[in-house]
């Protein structure tokens, strides 16, 4: 494994970025580990972070009128989780919990938008 792969391995989802941009991305990110059955976010929570699932499995779900769990989507890392909520500046429309132990990178979306989405380059 080369030094760039070691340094940015968790960010391979963004491998198309230049090294200086990957450094910027790391500066606005926090890596967290979660255990099976922990909650990442609840329906109605504000979408402050872009969530990059590095490893593990999550489920997005809601409840029907009889309070039965309705699974909307399962994701296996690496994957972005409910990123459309960030783009649309909406609160989450579902809950997200972990089906396995997992690692997630939380990217400050406001800073991400300023650094990467609103620049013409």
Per-segment meaning from a language model:
Residues 1-36, 80-81, 85-90:
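Cyclic nucleotide-binding regulatory module and flanking cytosolic helices
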Residues 71-121:
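Cyclic-nucleotide recognition modules
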Residues 26-27, 45-47:
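Short, small/polar residue-rich loop motifs at catalytic or cofactor-binding pockets
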Residues 42, 60-61, 83:
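A generic structural signal for residues embedded in beta-strands
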Residues 61-67:
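Cytochrome P450 core scaffold surrounding the K-helix E-X-X-R motif
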Residues 37, 48-61, 77-78:
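Glycine- and acidic-residue-biased ligand/ion/polar-headgroup-sensing regions
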Residues 39-45:
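Short phosphate-coordinating micro-motif centered on Lys-Gly-acidic
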């Amino acid at each position: 494994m080369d030094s760039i792969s070691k340094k940015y391995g968790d960010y391979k989802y963004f491998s198309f970025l230049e090294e200086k941009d990957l450094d910027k991305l790391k500066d606005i990110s926090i890596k967290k580990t979660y255990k099976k059955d922990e909650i990442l976010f609840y329906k109605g929570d504000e979408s402050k972070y872009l969530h990059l699932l590095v490893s593990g499995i999550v489920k997005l779900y809601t409840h029907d009128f009889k309070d039965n769990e309705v699974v909307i989507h399962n994701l296996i890392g690496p994957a972005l989780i409910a990123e459309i909520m960030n783009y649309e500046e909406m609160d989450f429309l579902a809950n997200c919990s972990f089906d396995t132990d997992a690692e997630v990178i939380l990217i400050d979306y406001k800073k991400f938008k300023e650094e990467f989405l609103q620049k013409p380059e």
